[in-house]
Amino acid sequence: KDIIEEIVNLVHEAEERFDSEIYIVSDEPYRKIIFDDLEYPNVFELHNRYIVATSHSKDLALPGERIGYIAVHPNIDDKTELIDALIFCNRSLGFVNAPALMQHVVESLQSVTVDVGEYQKKRDFLYPKLIKMGYKVVKPNGAFYMFPRSPIKDDVKFTEELLNHKVLVVPGTGFGLPGYFRLSYCLEDSILEGSLSGFEAAISKYSDN
């Protein structure tokens, strides 16, 4: 919440400086996948001109499904104009819509989510193992990704080294984080356990660098 409040404060300062209304658009597909008893803040309490876009592909474990919604503050100005613009974008840009049945039931899905505890257990299994091997990584508070620092500057080269050990990760360069790599731990426990030897072998090769 502190980070979001900092962003909102910056927006409020900019609105005063430029005498203009500024909208915050937040993409929040992981808002329900939070660990350690943390809670996601109600962003609409912080800023009237807040637009939230979210997808149930993550919190319902339906990868690839186009099921979600866009929510705006109830006191936002020009709601009709905004809705018209969203409908226009959806029609003209060729997005794939959710099946009609899912569009009707999506409202009833708001209190439903995957077992977040399962993701947290996987995080709690993998994180200390990577730290012990020598990887530098921030412990995530949600979702199901980690961004360890590559032990060498060339993150692409290191991901190729991991691939040689049958561990598939993605270079951080593709996410604007050169020098890091992204791994996903929403996998079977046996796969996570099987990856440990590969992570160990890869970092051992560059441990003196």
Located regions from the model:
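PLP-dependent class I/II
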Residues: 1-209
